From Swiss-Prot:
Name of the coding gene: atpB
The entry's keywords: ATP synthesis, Cell inner membrane, Cell membrane, CF(0), Hydrogen ion transport, Ion transport, Membrane, Transmembrane, Transmembrane helix, Transport
PROSITE patterns: ATPASE_A
NCBIfam families (UniProt xref): ATP_synt_6_or_A (TIGR01131), PRK05815.1-1 (NF004477)
HAMAP family noted in UniProt: ATP_synth_a_bact
Family to which this protein belongs: Belongs to the ATPase A chain family.
Protein name (Swiss-Prot/TrEMBL): ATP synthase subunit a
InterPro entries, per the entry: ATP_syn_F0_a_bact/chloroplast, ATP_synth_F0_asu, ATP_synth_F0_asu_AS, F0_ATP_A_sf
Topology in the lipid bilayer: Multi-pass membrane protein
């Protein structure tokens, strides 16, 4: 990964691959790239992980463009392979929505579809060899005059807690919105304060239900992040091994990891559907 003859240790190699390309505002008011994790921490809230943002937006755009173009060409006569694939995915999503969502809301199925496909695409970046995109980013950085040791690129968006928390917070906002819309502000407040032990235990009920409510987005985010971060770490550790050992370990792990990529997207999507169903239920 180095553009010089400097020896790269295992520790520095791992740290380099686990650090995001961070741009933000330093305490002195200036905006620039972080060269170390400590500099990234100094930025506080105003720190943007450009690698996570760029990869996630590019994959999201590819998803929308692909589905739009295939949708425009859909036909009932001789469907293409792409059309058959999309129809299969949509049928799969609809089956899950019908099985878990017992109310009527035309937004839930598109939300589930977008969530599933987008997370699958972001998770799939974990199957790209760990040095490819960081190397490209380093070469671009050198071309722009940057020190290659200070050019980072973490290519799996879902291995960044900011991405998974961002998605789960979006889902959390929808849960709150539909809970109030379907049950009314009073009904939603009663759900948080009068259950599970009745009105006499209102403070205790509020504590339990509040924790349960907040745990939904937190568990959504951390489950996805933890699994993808662990998978990325294993690929990085395999990359530290001799070349002949890498292929004997990386291929079986990559094949197994395909299951993790799909399973984590499916779990996230399923929980989104379940949480949306709970938000629409009139009774707790």
């Amino acid at each position: 990964m180095s553009a010089t003859n400097e020896v790269i240790t295992s520790g520095s190699y791992i740290k380099h691959h686990l650090q995001n390309l961070t741009y933000g505002q330093f305490p002195d008011g200036h905006w620039r790239f972080a060269h170390t994790t400590s500099e990234a921490k100094e930025m506080g809230f105003w720190a943007f992980h450009l690698d996570t943002l760029s990869i996630s937006f590019i994959l999201g755009a590819l998803f929308l463009i692909f589905f739009y173009k295939v949708g425009k060409k859909m036909t009932s006569d001789t469907p293409s392979g792409a059309q058959n694939f999309i129809e299969s995915v949509i049928d799969f999503i609809n089956d899950n929505v019908r099985g878990s969502f017992n109310s009527q809301n035309p937004m839930v199925a598109p939300l589930a579809l977008t969530t599933f496909i987008w997370i699958v695409l972001m998770n799939t970046m974990d199957l790209v060899p760990v040095d490819w995109l960081p190397y490209v980013a380093q070469q671009i950085g050198v071309w722009l005059g940057a020190d290659p040791h200070h050019v980072f690129f973490k290519m799996v968006p879902t291995a960044d807690p900011n991405a998974t928390l961002g998605m789960s917070i979006g889902i959390f906002i929808l849960i709150i919105y539909y809970s109030i819309k379907e049950k009314g502000a009073g009904g939603f407040a009663a759900e948080l304060t009068f259950h599970p032990f009745g009105k006499m235990m209102l403070p205790f009920n509020l504590f339990l239900e509040g924790v349960n409510l907040i745990a939904k987005p937190v568990s959504l985010a951390l489950r996805l992040f933890g699994n993808m971060y662990a998978g990325e770490m294993i690929f990085i550790l395999i990359a530290l091994l001799p070349f002949w050992v890498q292929w004997s370990l990386s291929l079986p792990w990559a094949i197994f990891h395909i299951l993790i990529v799909l399973l984590q997207a499916f779990i996230f999507m399923t929980l989104v559907i379940v949480y949306m169903d709970m938000a629409h239920q009139k009774k707790h």
